[in-house]
Amino acid sequence: MTTSSGRVSWFKSESSIRSIEFIVGALAVGYVFWKLQFVTTAICCGDFDGYYHIKWTQTLWEGIKSGHFPPQFPWLPLTTINSKDYVDHHLLFHIFQIPFAASPDPRLGAKIASALFGSLAVLSCYWLLLRYRVRYALVWLIALLACSAPFLFRMNMAKAPPFAIIFLVIAIHLFFQRKYWPLLPLAVVFTWTYDLFVLLILAAVFWSVSIAITEKRFEWRPLVYVIAGCVLGLIVNPYFPHNLQLLVEHMKIKLTASDFDTKVGSEWYPYDSWEFLGNSAVACIAMLVGYLGFEPSERRRGQYPIFFLLLATALMIMTARWKRIAEYWPPFAVLFAGFSLRPWLEGYRPYLTRLPAEVLEELKPFLDREGFPVPVEKPSTFRDVVQTTVVASVAVVLAVFFFFNFFATRQEIKQSESHDYYQAGAEWMRKNVPPGQLVFNTDWDDFPRLFYFDPTHYYVSGLDPGYLFDKNAELSRLYDRITLGTEEDPAPLIRDRFGARYVFSDNTHHDFFEHARNSGWFDIVYEDTQCTIMYIRDEKVEEELGVP
């Protein structure tokens, strides 16, 4: 009987309720990410970078097993990440991927890893709400899943950003617990995992500002530990000092407020205003709710919402400037709303702290704790009904947003190129082009799939066009002119300036193909519905492009 009553008591306890809420949340989040990830056979999605990451993870693992760490990267010899200067700025992310890349089907392993890492990122935010007892946690979970369609999409990409969210949540918990020394190893791990470790420095700055506002003192420890950890991660690094050079290159290209000198991925350009609002409506509403509910007058209780106000606002501004931040701002906008509303949801009267000092002195005997407003009296049955109705209504509205975003994201992922896209062309090169040849690829963002399916050849540009531009700006501009079709006789330039005899292209570079067809220099050696491979002849012939 005692055991039975003990079990009943445990299930009624706050800790058990939170545990059940977390398990339910984990199952829901895992299901959502699984359904999104496996709507396509390809490594998800938007771009082909996931193919590079999983292939390089395989290469890294083979290098570790053979005692060659880090292995050489000879695949982009004309860029700043040539074999001598290559930097793996996702090193730990690739190490985290090793158990999945070592599977018989690395494609499947990459997809499972993506679903797992994305789920953990969302769950870390949900855990923070549970840990700090923000009421109606499951409603906030729906808000996290509904906050932004680009957030759902980008969290499913086989990339490192989910770890950035996880590490930021861990850091926030350490801030709130005033446990600062673990920030140093966390910063080291963050720096080894992803080059957006600067977000951790930004978070440390905002926490110190929050302490300064509420406690009127300068809290230097989080700043020192985080900066020291980041510096240590940069220096104690197998790629030092080249990693510093690459970091400077990234900052120079990506953080400029003007137009880029060379074309970069669309993620580094700003959103259109209506696109920004439409894609992240729940996140925008969460920011508005956070601002309206923000009450900084309580000292200790005010630190959390002040911190999230600063962090979420900064991320929102960055998202408006760069689409690339779309996976960071939305969940922290929801956390900002949750922690701003926390006192109100708990029934406290923060407006009491705005009363004149003499009035507060008169009320002091009626307040239950020094420096804290008292809870509102226990609601009546009518108020319970009203409160439940409001919460249920909010949950329904959020669910509508979620289903809209979920199906829109699912449809967008479904439209991604299939896994075998470029596979036939790349395998033809692997069998018919001598190993070690440099191939002129007409799109820099085709490189990841070419690297995945045909690692026996090297390529002119890939991963980021800035790598070619920073190595040789003149050559990069020539590459753009050739691929965009403004050079009428491209073959001698490709052969003499780039050192390539084979050209790999998708079938959408119409101007380039027109000039190639009329030049008399090219033979089509392979062609399908996805790509075309051409060979530059030794001598020009007066005939149109044809199959030899």
Spell out what each predicted region is:
Residues 1-37, 383-394:
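Start-transfer (signal-anchor) and selected internal transmembrane alpha helices
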Residues 42-49, 61-68, 195-202, 206-300, ...:
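Transmembrane catalytic cores of multi-pass membrane glycosyltransferases
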Residues 77-105:
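Short hydrophobic/aromatic helix or loop-helix immediately within or flanking a transmembrane segment
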Residues 112-133:
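Transmembrane-helix motifs of polytopic, lipid-linked glycan transferases
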Residues 148-151, 169-174, 181-195, 200-203, ...:
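Membrane-interface alpha helices of multi-pass inner-membrane proteins
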Residues 168-182, 288-301:
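Membrane-interface transmembrane helices that cradle and orient dolichyl/undecaprenyl
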Residues 359-431, 444-447, 463-465, 474, ...:
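Membrane-proximal, lumen/periplasm-facing interface regions of secretory-pathway glyco-
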Residues 431-471, 496, 500-509, 534:
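Short periplasmic/luminal acceptor-recognition loop of GT-C membrane glycosyltransferases, typified by
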